[in-house]
Amino acid sequence: MVQRILMLALVLLAFTMPTEAITLQELQTSPQFKLVHVQAMNPTMERGGLYIYLNTYSIEATHYAPPQYSLRGTYYVVIDTDYQSTIEEKQLTVDYDTNYSLATLIHSSRMMNPSPSTLALIEASESKSGLAMTEVDVAKYTFDGATKPMHYVNDTRKFPLNRNNTIMYDIADAMFMSVYQQHFDDIVVQ
């Protein structure tokens, strides 16, 4: 009888525990999380900063019609400062058009002009990156995994992703690399 009560208590406990919470230790040690970006907030301090981890197990292809691809995945923004220590979970959907990858732009410009200027290539790559993204806030946690209240303002409009936005561009490229084992800008469409 006591054994049945204990088993029932364990089952109830298992179903009432939050399963999606994430801790800083899990982000730092689990192989499914890839550190994509690090930025020190204050170079004079030994700790603290902005860290972005990509959950490589969460990435899924939502559209596959080469040269267009769409991927959806989850990433975590870790903010560690003296006044704030949080983990923000976000879902990112990125549309990729490899007609605008850097390698394709170089290849097509060489086909049209055997000696393209570097300036023309830079202007072409900055005018359109071939990436568009949608970002949705999912949750906010403390470093030990406790859920924090969060104000959700989710704008589901797609907006172009510029190569100068290195943080988001690196996340999008890491997602592409995780699924297709090559960088987005290395693909040549002929």
Where are these regions (language model features)?
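Cleavable N-terminal signal peptides
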Residues: 8-9, 19
